[in-house]
Amino acid sequence: MLEGKVAVVTGGGQGIGAAIAQLFAENGMKVVIAEIDEEAGVEREEMLRERGLDVTFVKTDVADENSVKNMVRKTVEIYGGVDVLVNNAAVMSVKSIFERPLEEWERVIRVNLTGPYICSRYCAEEMIKRGGGVIINIASTRAFQSEPDTEPYSASKGGLVALTHSLAVSLSRYHIRVVSISPGWIETSEWKKKSLRKKPDLRPIDHEQHPAGRVGNPLDIAHLCVFLADDEKAGFITGTNFIVDGGMTVKMIYEE
């Protein structure tokens, strides 16, 4: 049962994180939207509170240890503890390896990989006080296949999958499960903050090239998070990665 549990969702103001925060709250959870974009965080908090859902926005930079510690402290002050953490916040860099400054590489790794490590550490301390918990890392199919000029993103997501099984083993003694989800093509246009929100601009071929027959949407990931966060339903699942990509990574590609 998820009713009354406390969840932290990083990057919960927009995109996949917003869908996860919403479904968690709709299932009776108390949700902290840990978001660096204040406009997005406030909008999402107001939108969900208008529906009677129990959510709180806390401005958070997952790449900053003090910011994370402050977010966890506020979560405990408001809701009494932490039961579930979703490490979703991430940034992207698309640039030639010959043109990308080292600082840009380091920023992506810091947010996408070090951030989840920091959040896991401080949230796990609170989970232990409550007898256990669940950490869900949002990785990517880019951990296993790539497009050109995405080295830091792919490396960070590959590292996050490895961090998942490592934490699962280390934290098992505290009854904390750790899993990861690797989304494929997820269309997030309608889940952005108002100033960026728009209708998806997708072609028929975008859907047709997926064995599932369509491009994914944030709720595809959020529904799996709801299942994985529930110890009654997913209590025997830890240390593994779920690929949610409409079958794209198992499809043979031929040029005709």
Swiss-Prot record:
The keyword NADP applies. Keywords: NADP, Oxidoreductase. NADP(+) binds at residues 9-33. It comes from the Bacteria. Substrate binds at residue 140. The active site is at 153 (proton acceptor). One of its GO terms (molecular function) is oxidoreductase activity. Belongs to the short-chain dehydrogenases/reductases (SDR) family. This is Uncharacterized oxidoreductase TM_0019. It comes from Thermotoga maritima (strain ATCC 43589 / DSM 3109 / JCM 10099 / NBRC 100826 / MSB8).
